[in-house]
Amino acid sequence: MIRTLLMLTFWALAAPLAALIGFPASFIMGDVRVLYRLFMWGAWAGVWVTGVRVETVGLDQFDHSRSYIFMTNHVSNIDPPIQIPLIPRRTSVMVKKELFKFPILGRAMRMGSLVPVDRSNRDAGIEAVRAAKSVIEQGLNMAIYVEGKRSFDGKLLPFKKGPFYLAVECGVPVIPVTIVGTHYIMPKARFAIKPGLVKVIFHPPIEPQDFGDRESLMEKVRAAVESGLPEEFRHPASARADVRGKGTEAPEGTAYA
């Protein structure tokens, strides 16, 4: 609990400082990258002070000048502040609309082109996918936690179909990502953070010409993400078809759950 409070206190102190520097600099320069980098540094540093250390795999195997959709598993609230700062270029995410109500955070997220999503409203989910498409067309990356919510036991949940609709519509490469370790550090049912090692695996990009249809792309992403999980978090072969077959129909996606 102390480590969690330390992280939250650090963020509470760092956010106004980042805003004090980043907002004027962004307005003067007409570029939000200063603000973005400050907030990414703050997110990373906040995780670091808790004793969490991160190992990355595969960051050197894709072109950092291109836009990608990163499709990632989700087991902990600490996943986004670990993953997003690792990605070299500006990256947007879909986040709960409630987070936009916080004055400094909400303003920064709007300037950073983050996409609000209302998970209780199917039509709002569709609108969020359209907004995400617009963000990608601006040249930004998009990170999506394709299960739509956190997994309680660390195993993959059914994937939302919206992210795959988005990928096919935009025609940009998809990078499957596996996050390993946050289930132990801060699982869904616990607020306290334990120190430990997190591994973030960036799998090889899936190029648009290799997508096939949306179902085929979903299968490829799921296979890649699951391949990076420890054996105890992989579904038995006999159960995989059932899990894959339960994907929701609405185009949805959210970064936090």
Predicted feature locations:
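Short, hinge-like loop/turn segments at secondary-structure boundaries
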Residues: 73-74, 110-112, 192-195
